[in-house]
A protein has these predicted regions:
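Acidic, polar-rich N-terminal leader regions of halophilic archaeal proteins
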Residues: 1-201
């Protein structure tokens, strides 16, 4: 049985009460090793169990008070798992930022099956950008981050590449930088801290 990745727990604790259901699924999908689209439902449950144990242990040590940094995690295992089930969309296309997807039976993903079918396991960042710009109805409209322009906000791009490409964000970022240096990718020159990435025309 695969070991659970401590980076998931660390990132979840850091986010605390602001951690959203879809963000936790994406964290698991990004950090837990896997070679197929999405994460096994049992693996998601194991992480929920671990976070629940972590929360109960922390609550006991602080007697119900705030964490040392002034925040409280308040993770509810059962509510999280119920929310995962409720958000599963029976579709292969993008259904909004709150949706989760089942790219295969008993597997959960932050992104639709069609994205995995087209790009699963790839780290060709230009291919990702073109796909996200041209083949994902509604996705760009749902993004709240990024500067002006018609490209993909870099942080969002790194999320998609790391999850669908089944790699780490450092590798994804290195691929973006390589694409810029090669002239395959450009950024809109609006000086926004998260400028949008697009293919060179």
């Amino acid at each position: 049985m695969a070991e659970l990745n401590e980076d998931v727990f660390a990132a979840a604790r850091q986010r605390g009460r602001t951690l959203l259901t879809e963000e936790l699924v994406a964290l698991i999908e990004r950090h837990h090793p896997h070679d197929r689209p999405g994460i096994e439902r049992d693996i998601v449950t194991r992480y929920a169990d671990g976070l629940d144990t972590d929360e109960r242990s922390s609550s006991s040590s602080r007697d119900g008070g705030p964490d040392d940094d002034g925040t409280s995690f308040d993770f509810d295992r059962d509510a999280f798992l119920d929310e995962v089930d409720a958000r599963l969309a029976d579709t292969e296309t993008w259904q909004g930022t709150d949706a989760l997807y089942a790219p295969e039976d008993d597997r959960v993903s932050r992104y639709p099956a069609r994205w995995h079918d087209a790009l699963g396991g790839s780290t060709d960042v230009r291919e990702f950008v073109v796909f996200l710009l041209e083949e994902t109805d509604g996705y760009l409209d749902d993004l709240e981050s990024g500067g002006a322009g018609r490209g993909i906000p870099e942080d969002e791009l790194l999320d998609v590449v790391s999850v669908v490409g089944r790699t780490d964000r450092e590798t994804a970022k290195a691929r973006v930088e390589s694409g810029r240096k090669a002239g395959d990718l450009v950024e809109d020159a609006d000086q926004h801290p998260e400028a949008r990435v697009r293919p060179r025309e």
